[in-house]
C-alpha cells in the first residue's frame, strides 16, 4: 500500500470502539504508516469526515 491510495476497511481483527466499527465497509485514503511492535506496521487511514486511525494491512483492501 502507498500513501494516497484509496482503501476499504474489509474486516476488524480486534475488539474496537463503536467509532471504529462504523468504519467497516467504508473507503478512506492512506495517509501514512505506524510502527507497531518492531515487526508489524499499521496503515493510517483518513476518511471523508477527516477522522483518521490505523489498521492492520490485512484489514484493508486496495480499491
Predicted ranges, named:
Residues 2-63:
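Basic/aromatic-rich interaction segments and small domains that mediate binding to polyanionic partners
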Amino acid at each position: 500500500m502507498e500513501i494516497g491510495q484509496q482503501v476499504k476497511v474489509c474486516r476488524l481483527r480486534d475488539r474496537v470502539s463503536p467509532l471504529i466499527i462504523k468504519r467497516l465497509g467504508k473507503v478512506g485514503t492512506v495517509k501514512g504508516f505506524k510502527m507497531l511492535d518492531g515487526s508489524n506496521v499499521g496503515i493510517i487511514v483518513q476518511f471523508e469526515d477527516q477522522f483518521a486511525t490505523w489498521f492492520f494491512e490485512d484489514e484493508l483492501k486496495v480499491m
